[in-house]
Amino acid sequence: MSRLFYFGSDSMLEEQRNPYVKLLSVNQALELGLEINSDLLDDNFNQATPEVILFCEDETKFEYPNIFSINKEDYYDDIGTSKQFCTALEWKYSVDTVDVVLKYIQNHLKTAPELELWSVWLGSEELPAYGKRTLCKVSDLTADRLKEFYISESDFQCLTVVG
């Protein structure tokens, strides 16, 4: 099983990529003086091929939130939402990252009536309809509330945040 955090909305969701992570070609990585796996240095491999190596200069910045579009129909499991637009949220809770997530939610709700934040264990036998659902006003949403959501072990949970 793997855990999927994602947002659902009937309004278009913006992507927000981790600015500290870069995808490099082997040549770019060599120019930076990075140690490269010998398989990638093989003569049969085109070292100019873009986006082969995932690079983050500071390992602590790797956990910065990465928010990108997903298609819920691409998942074998029912991921729970009936919302039209979805973005995956890759993150690890910390004092810094929770503020980024909180601001993302607040910004989205400037133009949308509500936003769902889901935590789903893919491969779970529990059905989304029976998962934990809570409603919260954006003015009441805090870092502590998001921390509780993050550490919860519920198979399916949805936090609906309204403006």
Model-derived segments and their meaning:
Residues 1-163:
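Structured alpha/beta or helical-core interaction and ligand-binding surfaces enriched in interleaved
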